[in-house]
Every structure is written in C-alpha cells, then in structure tokens.
C-alpha cells in the first residue's frame, strides 16, 4: 500500500503523475483550520506533506501523528516550526539549488531599475510627460564600476557577485558568517565587517534568511551609516529589515533609493508609504518567479519527498539529524 501524502499546491500534470506513482495523494488548496477539520482523516494518516507558503506549526503537526517528512517548494522555511519538526523527528526538505541563478537575475534587475529609474521614467512616458529632450530630472546613476556590498554570501550572493564582477566591473564587498574563498578568488570580493560595508558600498544588497539573529538586522542605525547616494536592495526576507526605519531613511534622504522584492507584511498593504515613493521599486516577491524555475522547484520538491520517505536525506534536507 502506498504511503499517503497531503498536497497543498497545484503541480504541473507530469509532476502530479510522478507523485501519484509513489503515493496516495490528497490535494487541497490550503492548510487553514477549516480545511484540516474537513479532511481530518487524510491529515491523520499522512506520512508526507508537500506545498509552499502555508504555516506549518505545532497545531497542525498535532493533527498529523504519522507525518514523517515535509517538502516545501521553496528555499526559505521560516513558515515552518523547525523545533517542533525536530522534536517529532519529521524531516524538512527544501529547494536551495533550483532557484539560485533566477533570484540573482532579480537582484541585478533591482540594481539596474533603481539606478536608472526604469519604472519611474517608464510611467512618466506613459503619462505623456516626454514632450522634449530629457533633462537632469530624468537622469539616473551609473552601475558599472560602482561598489557592490553583499550581505549574505551564499549561493545567491555568489551568483550576484559573478554578474556584478564580470558584467559590470563592480568592486565587491561582502559580509557573511565566514570568509568565502571562491568569492574572493573568482570575483576579487573583499570580506569586511557590516559597518564598513554599509559605509563604503554604493549598492547594499541584502540576501539573508530570516532567523532570530537576522530579524531587523538592518534598522535606523544601519541606514544612518550608509552613503546618502547609496541604493538599498532586499531580496532575502522582509523582516530582516526594520521597514519603518527604511521608510524614514528614504523620507529623510539618508539613502538615495531602494529596490525591494520582500516586505515585513506580504502582500504589501496598499497604504504603505513605500508605494508613494518614486525612488522605490516594489516587486511582489518575484525572486524565483519564472516558469522554468518554478517548474524546477516543484520537480525538486516532489523528488525530495520521494527521497525523504525512502530514507534518502543526503541532499536538500534542513534537519537530516532527525533521521539518524
């Protein structure tokens, strides 16, 4: 008899078929309490859980006594209670390798669009304001040759450094938990303390997961250290930044502009001051959102669940120790 799994995300047909070859699949739209109550028997018998963007906490896990593995279609897993999973010896699988290049593309797009004011001036053209040769009030700033500061030199940071170094001849500063020899050797990146990076970088790019240590890592004091000409980019997790402090820094002119793909509250409230600022590019968390990459992430997540429920946790497992 096949193990039972809960699927709470729509998959492409071929991936759905692959999943069903290995498991008895119960599909639903979400994991809210009403859904869980309606499908109580399926949750009670499920060995696996596959999806994304829903909260998986103690309250849900108590409804799933036979759960052995969860697989998220994402690299981030801050919506999972990892301690609760560990206590119950439930494996957590994710997709850290499937989206690296695409998210780095998004980061570079934010750098370019903020520097050259792409969104702002495109809207001005649509509004009929381009009636003569443009003047300085339409100008942006250069990207090539400017100093890029990367906070978080993981896989995505390394991919961004590659684009910046070879594509735009940008000197690179970085701050991370440890020195990154590949970044230093391939891209001439220079490790420095966060304070130094904030003071020297023309572009400050934040690429960090959300943890207790990184929550509000960048706040009022950090923005005050940046150049007034600095452009701030965040495509990691919204709560790593104190959003009120960011808004204040922009309003006071303490930094030049911001490009944001993540926010403290998502979707971003329609009354957010960020949406009124012409020097802010706000994206709806599209970091990995291409057809190709989202397919690859889903395929990886399916394979991850198959592997996990067969005892193979050599790759893409957040907590392999629970399988010991």
UniProtKB/Swiss-Prot annotation:
Primary location class: cytoplasm
Q: What is its EC number?
A: 1.1.1.79, 1.1.1.81
Q: Where are the transmembrane segments?
A: none
A GO cellular component entry from the record: plasma membrane
State the superkingdom.
Answer: Bacteria
Active-site residue numbers: 237, 266, 285 (proton donor)
Annotated compartments? Cytoplasm
Pfam families the record matches: 2-Hacid_dh, 2-Hacid_dh_C
Please name the GO terms that the record assigns under molecular function: glyoxylate reductase (NADPH) activity; hydroxypyruvate reductase (NADH) activity; hydroxypyruvate reductase (NADPH) activity; NAD binding
* Top-tier EC class: oxidoreductase
What InterPro entries would the database entry show? Answer: D-isomer_2-hydroxyacid_DH (IPR050223), D-isomer_2_OHA_DH_cat_dom (IPR006139), D-isomer_DH_CS (IPR029753), D-isomer_DH_NAD-bd (IPR006140), Glyo/OHPyrv_Rdtase_B (IPR023756), NAD(P)-bd_dom_sf (IPR036291)
Gene3D superfamilies hit by this protein: NAD(P)-binding Rossmann-like Domain
Instruction: List UniProt keywords, sorted A-Z.
Output: Cytoplasm, NAD, NADP, Oxidoreductase
Reaction(s) this enzyme catalyzes, per UniProt: glycolate + NADP(+) = glyoxylate + NADPH + H(+); (R)-glycerate + NAD(+) = 3-hydroxypyruvate + NADH + H(+); (R)-glycerate + NADP(+) = 3-hydroxypyruvate + NADPH + H(+)
PANTHER family in alphabetical order? 2-HYDROXYACID DEHYDROGENASE-RELATED, GLYOXYLATE_HYDROXYPYRUVATE REDUCTASE B
Q: What NCBIfam families does this protein map onto?
A: PRK15409.1 (NF011938)
What does the record note on quaternary structure?
Homodimer.
Functionally, this protein is described as follows:
Catalyzes the NADPH-dependent reduction of glyoxylate and hydroxypyruvate into glycolate and glycerate, respectively.
Q: Which family does it belong to?
A: Belongs to the D-isomer specific 2-hydroxyacid dehydrogenase family. GhrB subfamily.
This protein's name:
Glyoxylate/hydroxypyruvate reductase B
Q: Which organism is it from?
A: Enterobacter sp. (strain 638)
């Amino acid at each position: 008899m096949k193990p039972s799994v809960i699927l709470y995300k729509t998959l492409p047909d071929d991936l759905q078929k692959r999943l069903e070859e290995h498991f008895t699949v119960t599909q639903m739209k979400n994991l809210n309490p009403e859904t869980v109550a309606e499908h109580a028997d399926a949750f009670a018998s499920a060995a696996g859980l596959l999806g994304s963007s829903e909260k998986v906490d103690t309250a849900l896990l108590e409804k799933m006594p036979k759960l052995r593995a969860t697989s998220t279609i994402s690299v981030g897993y801050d919506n999972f209670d990892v301690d609760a999973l560990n206590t119950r010896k439930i494996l957590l699988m994710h997709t850290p390798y499937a989206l690296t290049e695409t998210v780095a593309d998004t980061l570079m797009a934010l750098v370019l669009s903020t520097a050259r004011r792409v969104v702002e001036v495109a809207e001005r053209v649509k509004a009929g304001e381009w009636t003569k040769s443009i003047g300085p009030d339409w100008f942006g700033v250069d990207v090539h040759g400017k100093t890029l500061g990367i906070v978080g030199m993981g896989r995505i940071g390394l991919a961004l450094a590659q684009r910046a170094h070879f594509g735009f001849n940008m000197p690179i500063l970085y701050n991370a938990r440890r020195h990154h020899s590949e970044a230093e050797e391939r891209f001439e990146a220079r490790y420095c303390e966060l304070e130094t990076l904030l003071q020297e970088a023309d572009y400050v790019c934040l690429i960090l997961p959300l943890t207790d240590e990184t929550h509000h890592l960048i706040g009022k004091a950090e923005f005050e250290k940046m150049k007034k000409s600095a452009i701030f980019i965040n495509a990691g997790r919204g709560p790593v930044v104190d959003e009120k402090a960011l808004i204040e820094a922009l309003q006071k002119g303490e930094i030049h502009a911001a490009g944001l793909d993540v926010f403290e509250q998502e979707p971003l409230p329609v009354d957010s001051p960020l949406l009124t600022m012409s020097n802010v590019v706000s994206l709806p968390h599209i970091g990995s959102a291409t057809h190709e990459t989202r397919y690859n992430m889903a395929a990886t997540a399916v394979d991850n669940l198959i592997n996990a429920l067969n005892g193979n946790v050599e790759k893409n497992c957040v907590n392999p120790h629970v399988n010991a």
